[in-house]
Amino acid sequence: MAAPCAEDPSLERHFKGHRDAVTCVDFSINTKQLASGSMDSCLMVWHMKPQSRAYRFTGHKDAVTCVNFSPSGHLLASGSRDKTVRIWVPNVKGESTVFRAHTATVRSVHFCSDGQSFVTASDDKTVKVWATHRQKFLFSLSQHINWVRCAKFSPDGRLIVSASDDKTVKLWDKSSRECVHSYCEHGGFVTYVDFHPSGTCIAAAGMDNTVKVWDVRTHRLLQHYQLHSAAVNGLSFHPSGNYLITASSDSTLKILDLMEGRLLYTLHGHQGPATTVAFSRTGEYFASGGSDEQVMVWKSNFDIVDHGEVTKVPRPPATLASSMGNLPEVDFPVPPGRGRSVESVQSQPQEPVSVPQTLTSTLEHIVGQLDVLTQTVSILEQRLTLTEDKLKQCLENQQLIMQRATP
C-alpha cells in the first residue's frame, strides 16, 4: 500500500462578516467553531459545518484585539481596546461576563491548559493573571517598560511568556511571580510570542520582520528567520511541533519547517496585511485574518507525511549549532505571484550524509527529554532544600520558645 503523499496547503473557505480589519482568530478544541475579533468591535463565531449561521457577539465598546477558546471549548475569552475582558458562552445567546481588566487596551488573552486561569497583557505595561470561574484577579507581572502585546502560558502552566514594545520577551515563573529571563535580541517592537508544544522553546515575532526561536532552559537563540519584507504580526506552532506559520504585513503567510530550519511555503491570500494566524488543535487546518476584513480557513495537507514516528511526541526545533553562521539572516528567495497561489521553496538541508534524519531526530528527542529530567530533578532538589530550611527554622523557633518558657 502506497504511503500518503503530502500536498500543498489549500484554501478551504473564507468568511465575510466583519466590517473592519480582523485582528485575531482561534479554533475551538473540536475544530467545530472558529472565533474571530475585529476592529469593528464585534466578535464572530463561525461554524465549520457548511450552511450554518455565524454568531455575532456585540458587547465590547471598541476594537476586539484578542480571542481564545478555553481548553474545554465551553468558554470564549476576548480582550478589547475598551480595556475589558469578556468571557462568553459560545452559543446563540452570546451571554458574557465582563472583567474590568486593565487601565489601557487589552492586547492579549490566553487560558491556562487546565482552564482554571487566564492571562492578559495590556498597553498599561502589565501582565495579569485571573481565576476563570471565581472571576477574580490573582496577581500582576509588571517589569515591562512599554506596551505588552502578548502573553501566553506554557503547556504545563508553570511559565508565562510575554512580548512587549520595549523590544524584550520576558519569561516568568507563575508560582514565584519572578521574571526568569529577558530575551533582548529583537531590533524592534515584539508583536507576538508563543510556546512550542513541547514547552521547551518559544518563538517571537517582531516589527523588525524577524522570527526568533529560543530554548527556555538554556536561553540560547536556536533559530532566526528573516523571511518577510514587513512586520510579522502573528505566528502559530503546528501541534506536532515541526512547523511554524507566520502572518505578516507584507500580506503573506509563511510556513517554516523547524526541524530543517527552512521555508516550506509562502501563501498569498489576503489583500493587504495578514494580521493573525492560528492552527487548529489537530493541525489539520489553520485560519488567518487580515486588514481586508476576511477570515480564511486553509487545509494544511503538508503534514500528512511527517518526520517519522517520533513526531507523535512534540519535540523542540533543531538547534542551529554548526549552521548558526548560515541560517540566521538568510532571506530565502520566494517566486513572485499573487492570488491563491502556494509557492514552495526548495532548499536542501545541511545535514551530515552519514547520519539518517530519523536517527538525528530521535537523538534530539532523547537529549530534550534528558534535559527535562535534569531540570525536574533540580527543581525537586531546590524544593527539598527549601523544606529542610523551613524545618530547621521551625525547630529553632520551638527551642527558643521552650527556653523562654523554662523558669
UniProtKB/Swiss-Prot annotation:
Highest taxon above the source species = Eukaryota
Q: What is its main location?
A: cytoplasm
**Matching Gene3D superfamilies:** YVTN repeat-like/Quinoprotein amine dehydrogenase (2.130.10.10)
| Keyword annotations | Cell projection, Ciliopathy, Cilium biogenesis/degradation, Coiled coil, Cytoplasm, Cytoskeleton, Disease variant, Dwarfism, Hypotrichosis, Repeat, WD repeat
**Can you say where the WD repeats lie in this chain?**
17-56, 59-98, 101-140, 143-182, 185-224, 227-266, 269-308
Per the record, the coiled-coil ranges are 369-397
Q: Which GO terms describe its biological process?
A: cilium assembly; growth plate cartilage chondrocyte development; mitotic spindle organization; non-motile cilium assembly; positive regulation of centrosome duplication; spermatogenesis
Its subcellular locations are:
Cytoplasm, Cytoskeleton, Microtubule organizing center, Centrosome; Cytoplasm, Cytoskeleton, Microtubule organizing center, Centrosome, Centriole; Cytoplasm, Cytoskeleton, Cilium basal body; Cytoplasm, Cytoskeleton, Spindle pole
Which CDD domains does the UniProt record give?
WD40 (cd00200)
Q: Which GO terms describe its cellular component?
A: centriole; centrosome; ciliary basal body; cytoplasm; spindle pole
PANTHER family reported in the protein's UniProt record: POC1 CENTRIOLAR PROTEIN HOMOLOG A, WD REPEAT-CONTAINING PROTEIN 55
Q: Give the family per the record.
A: Belongs to the WD repeat POC1 family.
Task: Indicate the quaternary assembly.
Answer: Interacts with POC1B.
- Role noted for this protein: Plays an important role in centriole assembly and/or stability and ciliogenesis. Involved in early steps of centriole duplication, as well as in the later steps of centriole length control. Acts in concert with POC1B to ensure centriole integrity and proper mitotic spindle formation.
Disease / disorder? Short stature, onychodysplasia, facial dysmorphism, and hypotrichosis: A syndrome characterized by severely short long bones, peculiar facies associated with paucity of hair, and nail anomalies. Growth retardation is evident on prenatal ultrasound as early as the second trimester of pregnancy, and affected individuals reach a final stature consistent with a height age of 6 years to 8 years. Relative macrocephaly is present during early childhood but head circumference is markedly low by adulthood. Psychomotor development is normal.
- Output this protein's name: POC1 centriolar protein homolog A
Q: Which gene encodes it?
A: POC1A
